[in-house]
Amino acid sequence: MSDKHINLVIVTGMSGAGKTVAIQSFEDLGYFTIDNMPPALVPKFLELIEQTNENRRVALVVDMRSRLFFKEINSTLDSIESNPSIDFWILFLDATDGELVSRYKETRRSHPLAADGRVLDGIRLERELLSPLKSMSQHVVDTTKLTPRQLRKTISDQFSEGSNQASFRIEVMSFGFKYGLPLDADLVFDVRFLPNPYYQVELREKTGLDEDVFNYVMSHPESEVFYKHLLNLIVPILPAYQKEGKSVLTVAIGCTGGQHRSVAFAHCLAESLATDWSVNESHRDQNRRKETVNRS
């Protein structure tokens, strides 16, 4: 990107999904940040940035706290998109209704759209109203299972200096179905049909990243056949996703607990795709069982 360009990230999403942590993360990365920016003021603010030699990496939180949000957001985005000197991305933070309710109960704050005080009603209305904006977003992050530290790392991985947000990147992740589907997944594959290392006593406490577990999972004939078909399905469609302008494609592979089979498969897939593509590998639930045991 040209140094004359403004690199703008608009941070939005569900109330309670982590926008405060997100904007603090951008500040730590060296972005000029503003929280609770009225949409109508964004174009004028960007004009001022263009006229200076100040930091041209900008992150703005634009959300439901602005009373005129829905009247102004579309015209604001049109104005930004028509400016050739601005490269911009929308980061949409989401979480399940149950998790958002839990967070509101913990903080004892009211939801901006809960006129009668019913948090869940406010969340459902907000989700409905934000649905079009979410569909426009280049980056959707589900924070349901993320700690603040994990969210900071996610943002750092995607937006730190030197990363190319405009490039196409593949996120390969493993997860456990018992802990819920990842909301930000584009493609989901189920490997629960494979033999489960959990029932091998010597493998139970290990993960799919351990060599003996990995070999156990991948050596079965069913694994070899499925993995071959998985590659044959995914690899040919990657250029099409890139051509359509998608910046991040999230491929999620799940097993029961997210500790053995899905971890091994996700690791294998990430290594295969990394020969030709930019790939990040993550394992959402691989240590969750151990954490549960330790807390009990």
Curated annotation (Swiss-Prot):
Residues annotated as binding GTP: D63, M64, R65, S66
GO molecular function terms attached to this record: ATP binding; GTP binding
Origin: domain of life: Bacteria
Keywords: ATP-binding, GTP-binding, Nucleotide-binding
Keyword Nucleotide-binding in record: yes
Pfam family, one: RapZ-like_N
Entry keyword Nucleotide-binding: yes
Amino-acid positions noted as binding ATP in the UniProt annotation, renumbered to this chain: G13, M14, S15, G16, A17, G18, K19, T20
Biological function: Displays ATPase and GTPase activities.
Entry's family note: Belongs to the RapZ-like family.
Protein name as it appears in the record: Nucleotide-binding protein spyM18_0713
Species per Swiss-Prot/TrEMBL record: Streptococcus pyogenes serotype M18 (strain MGAS8232)
